[in-house]
Amino acid sequence: MCKLSVSEAKQMLAEAARLNPGPWVRHSEYVAAAAGRIAARCGLDAEKAYTLGLLHDIGRRFGTGHIAHVYDGYHYLIKLGYADAARIALTHSFNNGSLDDYIGNYDISAEKQQKLSALLAAAECDDYDRLIQLCDAIATADGIVAIEERMNDVKRRYGFYPQRKWDKNIELKRYFED
């Protein structure tokens, strides 16, 4: 497993932005900034949290996919030897560890969905996974917002927001506030 520096993560995000520009890049930067700040206050490695935040959506470098960005990001980072970042790319959209709560299109094959589900089941989440899940739930492309505002925005755009996922986000917020 390779250690990922902030500089390397920024270069990877910049390359991804050239391949597939969009608001997801600024969102990733805000996730990273929030993760770094919260990590520093909670006794976690702020630099590690920042790099993981930068790369949580790195699968978007391959296009504008929905769940495909999770699958693609995980495999891309694994190939590069960044297991921790790959795990975060995998877990960031699934705060309950299940595909059932995914908000968006299932734009991968049934076979890839099964692989993704198995990877999620095997993932051993830690505070960095939880932190990026929280920061993903408070960061937009325009900055950090109240968690309820962000979840309502997603609900407006997709037409629903699973209650179980909503409740877990509130739980994560409380976890890092304590």
Locate each region found by the language model.
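Amphipathic alpha-helices of TPR/Sel1-like and other helical repeat/solenoid scaffolds
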Residues: 31-35
